[in-house]
């Protein structure tokens, strides 16, 4: 099938998924024509490669040797760095942002917010961090790179100098969610436990520019529920495959089950009801790593 056709990508993905159905979720990740074979041990890797090659041979598919890498501990996949530690930011993307100086017009600010959007899953509270930039995008006549913008820009660079490493949950593993709300943003982070240490899986953040005007005026409790709803929309594959425990001091479960609250909360309850979501109080923090992560995520 020619890749110029509109449905070529989805058709190719469907065919590849059907071909490698027996290996998906075990030792292989596929996105259209990009394939990653992952193994924990060298000997296992040889067996996994043999199984993949047999499938390719049965379907008479060929690999481009110049684009193949074997026995590597890390590599780029879909714009990210995949290593034994987890999913990391592509250093080239950070380098582009670090090379930027004071921005001179809304177009340059728009380019910056676009580059930051690519890294959203790695940036805690990205909507809060980038709010000064969003406020400048439409100011063509009265554009001014203020001290607030310069400070926010430097803080973004400092954060990206030590970006977090994203972890991938195991099948059927219980994962956790923390939420924070602000006047102009709602935020959520998914976390998994690995060896007693909690590691981030994905950050989600929505700014006032992305929220409807009415949503900006929601009560904090409603914004907290909205953060969970936005999380299910953005990360539906995680919420469908895992039990998600939302850790919060707010009584979200009570409100969602209440028949006396607003119509929109009832609608949200219906949306969230299809997922296996539990709500627990954030009563204790185990380990300094988690303490630092939560402090970074929840600080004003």
Language-model region placement:
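Short, conserved phosphate/pyrophosphate- and ester-handling motifs at nucleotide-, phospho-/glycolipid
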Residues: 4, 90, 180
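Active-site palm subdomain of RNA-directed nucleic acid polymerases
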Residues: 9-46, 122, 126, 233-243
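Two-metal-ion RNase H-like nuclease active-site motif
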Residues: 173-181
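Acidic, metal-ligating active-site segments
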Residues: 181-192
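Long, charged amphipathic helices and adjacent flexible linkers at domain junctions
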Residues: 298-300
